């Protein structure tokens, strides 16, 4: 699948109103995905602060419709470059920024919007300000470049080529190992539940264990959204290619691990973003009681005198779909001379205030849900 076909797919995705999104079968899953992304950006923000930078220069690669613009504002960004292959998505991102600018006047970061195929073009040639980036983010999009080795290498070079030593590269992408395991254990090379269906194009290739490192095409349909072919990106391979570009791994977690890691510090924001469904209630999103067996068991396990009436949860199908993704963080290596010259940095507290939480929550409701990147368009 060519980059022009990917662009055409995302350009055709229709925007859905807030009320319409609330009726979606994956409403809570989308909110949870956005919460995970918020926590990931918050983690990166702290690491950048620890590197002595309080107002980072940011590259938002495969930015889609600009769903993270408010997040960059809250992160204190001074300058952001937003690049995407889909021209309609970039137009919508520009409109979002104009709305933010009108509200905040001059108290906002500057932005350059670029329509570019980052699997073929040298993005640096298109960027006006040649200063290096402190932070690069690529959400639910990196794996599209793994159509072939050349495309993947160019995309990753664009991602980290202008990243300063000590700078951070974060992202989310489908967990190739988990997806392959799920398809192999399904019927006819596919996995399906109430909210998603994943199929591998070459069933014989899958059955024989001959899935290639590049060009391994699969289809991920989510909540009856338009299906755009994608490519598996094995994380050990992603890590290897980035290490060739002087990057070092900071962390990698599947979404289940990430949620457990960030749950306590981010609980209030998760509640504000409606990332969990209240169980039991009269209008559960799942179609059967089987979707909530674990939640029911946990409630029933409480002693009679301590029993609570409700709890927050996700349906079984939403949880299975969420577990198909992972988050990662890399850092650009510093030279020995740079390490020697370093002095302790004065860091800025990273915890979000209540007002910041309210702002990002309102942003997620009004805008980011249109932009859960791969999840949203099929989620930015």
From Swiss-Prot:
Record key words, sorted: Methyltransferase, mRNA capping, mRNA processing, Nucleus, RNA-binding, S-adenosyl-L-methionine, Transferase
Disordered: annotated span: 336-380
SUPFAM superfamilies according to UniProt: S-adenosyl-L-methionine-dependent methyltransferases
Domain of life: Eukaryota
GO molecular function per UniProt: mRNA 5'-cap (guanine-N7-)-methyltransferase activity; RNA binding
InterPro entries: mRNA_G-N7_MeTrfase_dom (IPR004971), mRNA_G-N7_MeTrfase_euk (IPR016899), RG7MT1 (IPR039753), SAM-dependent_MTases_sf (IPR029063)
Any GO BP annotation: 7-methylguanosine mRNA capping
Domain named mRNA cap 0 methyltransferase: residues: 24-333
Function, in words: mRNA-capping methyltransferase that methylates the N7 position of the added guanosine to the 5'-cap structure of mRNAs. Binds RNA containing 5'-terminal GpppC.
Name assigned to this protein: mRNA cap guanine-N(7) methyltransferase
Lineage: Eukaryota, Metazoa, Ecdysozoa, Nematoda, Chromadorea
